[in-house]
Amino acid sequence: SKGEKGQYFTPRYVIDMCVKMMNPKEDEYIIDTAAGSSGFTVHSIFHVWDAIRERKGLPKGENFTAEERSNDEIKYVEDRVFAIDFDEKAVRVAKTLNLIAGDGKTNVINLNTLDYSRWDEITKQDRWQDAYFEGFRRLKKIRPAGANDYKEFNFDVVMANPPFAGDIKENQIITRYELGKNSKGKWQNKVGRDILFIERNLNFLKPGGRMAIILPQGRFNNSSDQYIREFIAERCRILAVVGLHGNTFKPHTGTKTSVL
C-alpha cells in the first residue's frame, strides 16, 4: 500500500462491494480515474466475464490464470475498460496485474487525471507514446461529439479511490473546477485532491452514468464542506453512502472513509 500523497490501495472486499453495486455491463464503458494497481477495473473485468460466460451457458472461468478467453471477453477489455493514474510505478503494477488477469493491458494510462489541460503536452513525448498511445487513442473516442479538449467524456461507470491527503495548489488546475471555489464563490489558493476528483469524475460520466467514489468521512459531515455536498446533490441522484470501518486502510491510515 502506498502512502505518498494519500494514496492507499483499496482492499479487495471494498472493491467487490463497489463492483456489485455498480454492476457494469458488457456494453458499457468503465474507467478508474485514480487507478493505483487497477483493482476496480480488474474486478469489473471478472464481473463482466462471468456474465458473458453465464449468457453463453458456460461455467465461470478461473481468474488470474492463463485460461483462454473468448473473443467477446477479450473485446470487452480492449474496447470498454480504462484506467488512469499519475504515478508511473503504480501504472506499471496495474499493467502487470491486468496482464495476469488476462487483458491486453493497453488501456492503463499514465496521466494526471486532474491536470487535463496538459494532456496534449504529455502525450506528444516519444517515450510516453511508446507505452500508452493505443490506450489514449481509444480513450479519446469516448469524448462527446465535437469535443476538442479532455474535460468531458461519455463513460457509463466511474469507480475511484482518489488520494485524500494533500492539497492541489496549482492555480492552472484549480481554476478549471467549480469546486476550486469556496462556499462564497471565491477561488481558493489550495483545494483537497479528493474534492477536485468529485467534479472530475462527474465530468467523465455521461448523463445517467453511475459513480462510486471513496471519500474521507468529513466530506459528508463537516459544516465547512456543505457546499461540496450541495454541488453533488444538484448534479446527481445519490443512491447510497456506505460507511467503511476506521480500520479499512490501516495500518497505513486511520482516516474514516465512506463510499458515495
Q: In which residue ranges do the predicted regions lie?
A:
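Conserved Class I SAM-dependent methyltransferase catalytic core
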Residues: K186-T248, T253-T255, V259
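Hydrophobic alpha-helical scaffolding
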Residues: A83-D87, P144-N148, F153, V157, ...
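A short beta-strand submotif of the Rossmann-like class I SAM-dependent methyltransferase core
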Residues: A160
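Mobile active-site "lid"/loop adjacent to the S-adenosyl-L-methionine
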Residues: K56-G57, F164-L196
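A Trp-anchored, charged/polar loop motif used as the substrate-binding/catalytic surface
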Residues: Q129-N148, V191-E199, V241
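Conserved S-adenosyl-L-methionine
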Residues: E4, Y8-R137, F153, V157, ...
